[in-house]
Amino acid sequence: DFGDAGQVFDPIPYLGYLAASTERILLGTAGIVLPLRHPVTLAKEAATVDALSGGRLLLGLASGDRPGEYPFFGADFDRRGETYREGVRVMREIWEQAAQGRIDQDSFLPAPVDGTIPLIGIGGAQQSPAWAAENLDAHMTYHRAGPQMRAVAAQWRAISLKPFMTNLYLDLAENPDAPFEPIRLGARVGTTGLTDYLTGLASAGIAHINLVLRPGRRDVEDVMEEIGQDVIPALRARTASEPAGADIRS
């Protein structure tokens, strides 16, 4: 029971809008349900967004764990892991051929800016950790309490130096010194406690943290401004020497 209906907008047109509205931030999904999309179509759509954004796309791919969605697409829920692997293979092959100019009669354009697009496995995606480490560029998992998060990150680090990522559902308190209060998949906390907590996650080897502001009770722009002014600079100063793993896209 995920307790939500997912993203309101379809991610691909939404990413096109964001690509035209921004200049520097990375754009990503967390994630598109790959077994419910044709991989050739998705490869074309993703490459288009990547080209329009100047190479800023990170493509997070999930297997989809809501059985009720699959009948609408005539897809086999029980084979979603196999379909996922095949989709990744097809997209990688298409982008490689496009980047090398090896598609002649039915040319695939545009090619991704850097020849390929970073693929992030969202959740387990019905795959073994070994397969994910070999075939994907990063792994993102749902948030657990601090000690559990450290253990999960260590398991990934044992098999891969590729980036390990997590979501953190955040309700940022107005009081910067508000204590850390766990909520489902995240926390209610002030900026001071948030900085401390994110520092701990970075020291555990977590390279990227996706802050989900959906549970928040404050204006989103105010929250983003506070994080930008009070949290990110302090976090950068504290974690400058942390070996958090390779970056996905500079």
Task: Please place each PLM-identified region on the residue numbering.
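Active-site-adjacent structural elements that line small-molecule/cofactor binding pockets in enzymes
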Residues: D1-S250
